[in-house]
Amino acid sequence: MEAAAAIAPQRAWGKGRLVAKTGGARTRIAGLYQEGCAKIRLPRTFDASMEAVLINSSGGVTGGDRLAWEFEAGEGTNLTLTTQACEKVYKASVDTAVVATRISVAARGHVDWLPQESILFDRSALSRSLEVDLAPDASFLALEAVLIGRKAMGETVRSGLFRDHWRIRSGGALVHAENLALAGDIAALGSRRAVLDGAVAFATLVYVAPDCEALLPRLRTSLAEHALSGVSHFAVNGRDKIVARVVAADGFALRKILIPLISHLRKGASVPRVWTL
């Protein structure tokens, strides 16, 4: 009798690419590519900006999945990138899920990178990267929010792997870099005062633009009552940036803090509508 052939688990793979340009005083589509589980939808907007909603049609990621996103915002464009739903990161039996995002913004362009939260499940494994190249006079807002399980669903996360790698450059010069790693006993790590102090929801906001100093006071006032959260202003390689770290007890509390901050940095515009659907 012949031995049964080993069958590798099916894994999700997807690649999406969007190019935006200006035309008729509006930001318009110049190129769109979708493959595998990566989908991009462009809802109607009622101003000069463009909004793109990213969809992972596999319904989440697990070990071995691969997703790649690439976005080009042309001169003078205004592009908002968000996701249809929170990205669920499920238990990984083998390997690590990899999600890579690349964004380039040309002269006088602006991009808001505002995905909804990533939800980590117990024994999940995700390695994520964000690479951004800005023209010297382009501006950029980025948010990444993470939930270590969902309190309302009674979920707990004991162990797993989460890596987040950011590199933001302007005119080729590095203006922001960070490497976050939660590995092994995430529950014990997150309980430390210097990490999350037992909280299960956290986010990072980065804003690169000339008007950082004017926006800073209101951000500091908004975060003053949240002991584990804070905001700072830096000048790096000729560019101003704001970095805000937000920690909350759960996802609902995190959104209550984040939405006013995002609206302030977007000059009064709220979060993408898909966040509220």
From Swiss-Prot:
CC annotations in GO: cytoplasm
Pfam short name (any one): UreD
Protein location: Cytoplasm
UniProt xrefs under InterPro entries: UreD
Family to which the UniProt record says this protein belongs: Belongs to the UreD family.
Assembly and oligomerization: UreD, UreF and UreG form a complex that acts as a GTP-hydrolysis-dependent molecular chaperone, activating the urease apoprotein by helping to assemble the nickel containing metallocenter of UreC. The UreE protein probably delivers the nickel.
Name of the protein in its database record: Urease accessory protein UreD
Source organism per UniProt: Sinorhizobium medicae (strain WSM419) (Ensifer medicae)
The encoding gene: ureD
